[in-house]
Structures are given as structure tokens and as C-alpha cells.
Regions:
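An anionic, turn-rich surface loop/hairpin at beta-sheet edges
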Residues: 103-104
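Active-site proximal loop and beta-alpha junction motif in alpha/beta enzyme cores
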Residues: 1-100, 109-168
């Protein structure tokens, strides 16, 4: 297993809503980093069995929601037990669902921790691509300042940079 630290959450809005097809959804917003990667966290009851075409339409609509000037990755989630969440991510740029999204998973757990719905300690998040465990550590003021993902990883490609003029 590997453990990585994500950027700190910034620009949090926990009590937002978004409307699509005449339905109002709870919709938290968080960016990881400053400026950061934008995520909308949207609870969906029965997410595992939710109609795939309907979820895709909703993801496309919320991804471009006017309250998100950068657009947003849309992280649909359902709490399925104590410190256990199921999540699906509609990813901006890909413009479809992906098997997993580490920053999205961290964003969902940040939101749920701050709302008091999970402990923030070793929260299990199941996704199509597998399972991650998230730790959202809070400072004395209650702000999430350290966000960690733990899970397996696989090498999917290797490369070599050969341009000696490349400056990093």
C-alpha cells in the first residue's frame, strides 16, 4: 500500500445547492490547493443502483454549473456505513466517469468530516476502480490541514526524459 498527501482544502462551501432538471441537490464545493482543483460533492441516495444514463446527464450538467467558474469535477457519493462511502466521479477534461479520482475522494471525505458525517480517520471509500482509505486531519480551529490517501497502486507506464535542455 502507498500513502500520499494531497493539497490542503481551500475555498470550501459546505451548504450549497445546485439545480438540474427541476430537482435541487445538496452540493458542497471544495478546491484542493490555492488555486486548486475544483470539486462538487453531491450526495445521491441509492448511488450504486442509480440509472447510469441519468447519472451521466446529471454529471454533465453539474460539471458546468454556473456557481463553478472553473467548472468542477462532480463527485457523487453515498454513505453506506460508519466511515464507509461509495463514490463515483464525473471528471472535467475527461467529460465522463472515471474509475477513481484521488483528489475527488479527498474532497468528499473533507466535506463529510467537516459536516460530522464521518470521523476523518481511515475512512473507506469504494469506487469502480477500487478502494482508498482517507485520513482528514484537523487543526485546533477545526480546519482540515492534512489530507492523506492510502491504497494500492500499479505501474501503468514508464518513460524517460532525454532532453538535456529541459528545466524542471
Amino acid at each position: 500500500l502507498y500513502r500520499i498527501r494531497l493539497n490542503d482544502p481551500w475555498h470550501l462551501r459546505l451548504d450549497g445547492t445546485a439545480e438540474a432538471d427541476g430537482i435541487t441537490y445538496d452540493c458542497a464545493y471544495v478546491e484542493l490547493g490555492d488555486p486548486g482543483i475544483p470539486h462538487a460533492a453531491v450526495p445521491i441516495a441509492g448511488l450504486r443502483d442509480y440509472d447510469a444514463a441519468a447519472l451521466l446527464r446529471l454529471g454533465r450538467t453539474l460539471r458546468h454549473y454556473p456557481d463553478f467558474p472553473k467548472g468542477a469535477n462532480v463527485n457523487f457519493y453515498e454513505i453506506i456505513g460508519p466511515d464507509h462511502v461509495y463514490e463515483r466521479t464525473y471528471e472535467r477534461g475527461v467529460e465522463d466517469f472515471t474509475y477513481a479520482c484521488g483528489t475527488g475522494t479527498g474532497s468528499v471525505v473533507t466535506v463529510l468530516t467537516l459536516l460530522g458525517k464521518v470521523s476523518g480517520k481511515h475512512v473507506r471509500v469504494d469506487m469502480t476502480g477500487g478502494t482508498l482509505y482517507v485520513d482528514a486531519e484537523r487543526n485546533a480551529a477545526g480546519r482540515v490541514t492534512d489530507l492523506y490517501l492510502t491504497g494500492p497502486t500499479n505501474v501503468v507506464c514508464k518513460g524517460e526524459i532525454t532532453d538535456e535542455n529541459l528545466v524542471l
